[in-house]
UniProtKB/Swiss-Prot annotation:
Co-factor(s): Mg(2+)
GO molecular function list: [protein-PII] uridylyltransferase activity; phosphoric diester hydrolase activity
UniProt keyword Cell cycle, yes or no: no
Gene3D superfamilies, per the entry: 3.30.70.260, Beta Polymerase, domain 2, Hypothetical protein af1432, Nucleotidyltransferases domain 2
Signal peptide: none
Domain HD: 443-565
GO biological process: nitrogen fixation; regulation of nitrogen utilization
Cystine pairings recorded for this chain: none
Species this chain originates from: Burkholderia ambifaria (strain MC40-6)
Listed PROSITE patterns: ACT, HD
Protein name per UniProt: Bifunctional uridylyltransferase/uridylyl-removing enzyme
Classification lineage: Bacteria, Pseudomonadati, Pseudomonadota, Betaproteobacteria, Burkholderiales
Superkingdom of the organism of origin: Bacteria
Amino acid sequence: MSAHAAPSSEALSRRAEFKAAKADMLERFRSAANVASLMHALSKLTDDALKRVWDDCGLPATLALIAVGGYGRGELAPYSDVDILVLLPDAHDPALDARIERFIGMAWDLGLEIGSSVRTVAQCIEEASQDVTVQTSLLEARRIVGSTALFERFTVRYHEALDARAFFTAKVLEMRQRHAKFQDTPYSLEPNVKESPGGLRDLQTILWIARAAGFGSSWRELDTRGLITEREARELRRNEGFLKTLRARLHVIAGRRQDMLVFDLQTQAAESFGYRPTQAKRASEQLMRRYYWAAKAVTQLATILIQNIEAQLFPATSGITRVLSPDRFVEKQGMLEIVDDGVFERHPDAILEAFLLYEVTRGVKGLSARTLRALYNSREIMNNTWRRDPQNRRTFMQILQQPEGITHAFRLMNQTSVLGRYLLNFRRIVGQMQHDLYHVYTVDQHILMVLRNLRRFAVAEHAHEYPFCSQLIGNFERPWVLYVAALFHDIAKGRGGDHSTLGMADARRFCREHGITGDDAALIVWLVQHHLTMSQVAQKQDTSDPEVIKRFAEVVGNERYLTALYLLTVADIRGTSPKVWNTWKGKLLEDLYRITLAVLGGANPDAHSELKSRQEQALALLRLETVPDDAHRALWDQLDVGFFLRHDAADIAWQTRVLYRHVNAETAIVRARPSPIGDALQVLVYVKDRPDLFAGICAYFDRNGLSVLDARVSTTRHGYALDNFIVTQTERDVRYRDIANLVEQQLATRLAETAPLPEPSKGRLSRLSRTFPITPRVDLRADERGQYYILSVSANDRPGLLYSIARVLAEHQVGVHAARINTLGERVEDIFLLDGAGLSDNRLQIQLETELLRAIAV
């Protein structure tokens, strides 16, 4: 609100009248859903209200009240800002300022979100020359009331000063910068209907630059001008109508300006469009898929239009052309262009050839507007006959098998909808959301991200990112096999049933149709079937157990299959979300790969031989650090076999060096160091064991914003706990070396206290978890040997969750022998190895599971 006197009774009456009229319009929109009528009606209602206030303020006829921006277009969304310009003559009485201020205050009193400026014509032109945002808002200026002559003078001066070329360049740059803020993709899980790529702002930008150039201000006018076809104009109008309706519905549902399609509103928005949940898809998923298809079409058509407008504004002076494929394609100014509009109709196999040429031709940076338009209008050509054409199948395999350019080619094939036309099952997952709380991309974008990750392993310029993966793929024969597996690993998502099993059938059919036979075909199908296996073993099973390794090695069978699965697994996890991958998961996978490779090479997965090997390596490292030869014995004699199998040689050596003088310490020994794997802190705790120890340590981590990635808990023969934790700081850019000493001091002090365990903090769930909560699950069962109990917990992630679990265990005197903490984006799947004499009692098991479910409940 403006800083003026409280509204008068008359102002309050007008406000109520305005509010009632607006509410009536919104109610009609709820039932009729005619967004154009609503936006124009809201604009007229606002015009009439502002005219009355203008008249009441007695502003002279020499001034003009101008609507600018979306309001100037006559398109007001329910809770949009109302942007106005009070246009002054060059010579005006400064005494008018108070009346203008009163006018703006009274406009606010109506309940309008006013964005106002007060300028002369000269000031408008000056401001517009300095700021393209001002220039854009003035482009659609419309007189509401006041001097017609003054407004006409402004219009003439504005267009005289407007440089269409400079405006085009500025708006395209602005659009690129805006797209970059949204990661250059329309496929955000919470898109901004107005600002995201493929949103309303893209459509407005095109009409702005067309209007500035004098080409027209509507899709019909651009069609008449020849910049788009009648069909394209129809598509643009249809998608624009959908996006405007969606935005208006969001405003109405939220009761305020709301342009972001957030999780909380997706279901209500979907229901307002008449979508209803089915067994396979939520209502919100159906709406989002429609949104993504609309945004994708807008992105395609916007690219065509911008290139066409650019060609008219900046006619080429040196059209250097080279023939790339006789009678089909030429290169024109770095773009791949068809020789005429009938190429794809005469030669349907040229459709895929376009992407192969784009991929292999140096200097070609994209497809020209003419080529993009021809592709867009060739949908009927891409039919079953086209898909079955042996030449097309050969070309598709050539695209997959090139040494470079694969990722760019496939992204472009998806953007132009050619990929989904060629692989019909891929088309089914375009725009398919994944509500599993750790994928942040739609299924099609995730698949292309996995393909991109595999390709980066193979490109020398990126070898520093994941050197081990780059080394492996460099020695992997026919890496295109991995790319095919990547295309199919999630292709059956959203169909109901096991997507790995359904995807196998799709992959098998693809191999048969594309001449992939023998071991290559078998490997592709096997990878699709088992693409989750390695991550499940590495993150959820005890890989220090030789039996686990033996079973995994039997599933894999040979080195080629192991390497392929490892590379696909790393690429897959990294393609889910930037949050899900971390160096600790990378180490778990690499360790599993190396141990399994040794077993496949003939090494015996025997605990005794592995223990002996690690001890010898650890002793060699201790000698390098000048630890006396027999100094380790006092500690090692107290440790069981499990300790040596759970830690590698370097870790054993570090812990021995820290503890060999303190085997019978009376107070807690706490040591912390930056984790050798990076991006984490390793914390060692050595103290006399007690039932609440694990919970007490977790309480400290919880209170200090440290997230536990892994916990390895050992108990010595003489009753000491030797616990190791890998933790990360929730704050970014933390230097773990700087906080190591603080953690040592604070945690040692905390362990010396005898205070009862504090209440767990009830951390807030993220919006994603609140909107898509998962059912918490707790499973407690004895292990195969009956020595320990395995506790599996899955729940929405939140601060304090691990401590909540540990506290329940401590209250029942249940000791934690090992813990595998597995955070998958917004979801956790934790596994604990428990010891506790009473756990064989069924009543205790039921009580424990009940209390754990209560503790992890949202």
